[in-house]
Design a protein with these regions (language model features):
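Extended, charged alpha-helical coiled-coil/arm scaffolds that mediate oligomerization and mechanical coupling
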Residues: 1-107
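Conserved catalytic/switch belt of AAA+ P-loop NTPases
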Residues: 192-213
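Glycine/charge-rich, flexible interdomain linkers and switch-proximal surface loops
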Residues: 74-77, 81, 102-130
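Conserved alpha-helical scaffold flanking the Walker A/P-loop in AAA+ ATPase domains
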Residues: 167-191
Length: 213
């Protein structure tokens, strides 16, 4: 039993070390530290139960969120045009529309502070196989950003986007947060692919979650 307690204590120490190294917002870090103290207390008292599993899993995800880590945007219109032309033949109207988009981002960056700077949502519409997904990857490359692809087609539950309650054993975050964690930055391009192909019985719930996000 003492060996088991030692293993748990080492796991908690690793979580604490990760929290110290992570650039977590102050208020959130305070809450996470309270959770860690509660875990340490439960191990000391020998009261390991489901709560330990739930809390440690939550903390492990929380400390891996890349708070404060971003990629610098490359808003070079000539570079973007070169990237688009390398990956897609024709599509002149679409390319020009995206170049206009980059020009607007350039103006925003010059005239607004980083806090007020925002990139509008882009909607790619077209028949199957016309290059919507690959164009999104080209846009991410042109911007110098990482990309996270979330396939909505066939998704049967909004929980896949939002995630489960942390109180549920074996719970995990939704695909959006998972994608951000896996990308290692807070500002990846998030591609919601085949958004029109969500399962009929879950379509409204999924759209509701997207509006909320």
């Amino acid at each position: 039993m003492s060996d088991y307690k030692e293993i748990l204590s080492q796991e908690i120490a690793q979580l604490r070390a990760k929290l110290e190294q992570a650039q977590v917002p102050e208020e959130f870090a305070y809450q996470l530290k309270k959770e860690i103290v509660a875990l340490e207390r439960s191990v000391e008292l020998g009261s390991y139960d489901e709560k330990y599993e739930k809390t440690s899993r939550y903390l492990d995800w929380a400390v891996n969120v890349p708070f404060g880590k971003k990629t610098e945007d490359t808003l070079d219109i000539q570079k973007a045009k070169k990237v688009f032309d390398e990956h897609h033949y024709g599509m002149t109207e679409v390319k020009n529309r995206f170049l206009e988009y980059l020009a607007v981002l350039n103006l925003q960056k010059q005239n607004f502070s980083e806090e007020d700077f925002s990139a509008p949502i882009l909607l790619l519409v077209g028949l199957v196989g016309t290059g919507k997904t690959t164009f999104a990857y080209s846009l991410a490359e042109a911007l110098g950003r990482k990309i996270v692809r979330i396939p909505i087609g066939g998704m049967g539950s909004a929980k896949e986007l939002r995630g489960d309650s942390r109180l549920k054993l074996g719970s995990e975050p939704g695909k959006v947060l998972k994608g951000v964690v896996e990308s290692g930055v807070m500002n990846p391009v998030i591609l919601l692919d085949e958004i029109d192909r969500a399962a009929d019985d879950a379509n409204m719930d999924i759209m509701g979650v997207l509006v909320e996000l």
